[in-house]
Regions:
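Long protein-protein interaction modules used by eukaryotic assembly/scaffold proteins
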Residues: 2-30, 34, 77-217
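Short, structured protein-protein interaction patches enriched in aromatics and acidic/basic residues
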Residues: 54-91
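N-terminal ordered "arm"
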Residues: 12-67
Length: 217
């Protein structure tokens, strides 16, 4: 089953391809596709503020580049009126300016608050393919046209494409309520790293995304 058909009940009707926002090495500067202004305005302001905070840390570049890709879910009223799922990856443009890269897609209004069964499998598959696409964009120095070709291949063309989804590790996933966001290191495992935030992560929570969680002790 293709990603498009398996997730048809999960994603908004117009969401055949994910939208994206940010920087990749194959692009000379910032770019975006298929994300509404209501999402982009909130997202850009959030990242600009957070990256400014990171730059106050002397060792931030090394730790930033080693940060994981995060899978996220946004409740309504976080980045516009709608709910979203996506992935966020530390990245850099073609001239060495650091800025994260995100793929996101709007959730259908009928999606239940707790994902189970086929709905959960569709979300896990979407996150896996979005992560794969982000890594191909980063490692392949892809420009916007070639990156969209990757999305077309993964999300539309390859009905038999495989992914690294480890189905069965988690039986359900509660989506965040309105005004909150959920951040997952690996959404396919039951006890993976996760963070729940009011709105988008700020201050110490933003640092945790890109510099790592503080060690307890």
């Amino acid at each position: 089953m293709s990603v498009e058909s398996s997730s048809s009940s999960l994603l908004a009707p117009a969401a055949a391809l994910p939208g994206w926002f940010g920087k990749l090495p194959g692009m000379g500067d910032f770019a975006h596709r298929r994300l509404p202004e209501a999402f982009r305005a909130v997202w850009d302001q959030w990242l600009q503020r957070g990256m400014s905070r990171l730059r106050d840390r002397a060792d931030w570049t090394e730790r930033y580049l080693e940060a994981p890709i995060w899978c996220f879910a946004l409740g309504r009223q976080v980045a516009g009126d709608q709910a979203w799922i996506g992935v966020l990856m530390p990245s850099v443009d073609g001239v060495g300016r650091y800025f994260p890269f995100a793929l996101a897609v709007e959730l259908d209004a009928s999606v239940p608050g707790c994902l189970q069964g086929k709905a959960l499998a569709a979300a896990l598959r979407w996150w896996a393919f979005a992560t794969q696409a982000a890594l191909e964009g980063l490692d392949g120095d892809l420009d916007a046209v070639r990156f969209d070709a990757v999305l077309q291949r993964l999300f539309v063309a390859d009905s038999g494409a495989s992914s690294d989804v480890r189905e069965g590790g988690v039986e359900s996933l509660d989506l965040p309520l309105a005004g909150t966001s959920l951040w997952l290191g690996d959404p396919s495992v039951e006890n993976g790293v996760r963070m729940l935030s009011t709105g988008l992560p700020r201050d110490e929570q933003f640092e945790a995304l890109f510099l790592g969680f503080a060690e307890e002790g």
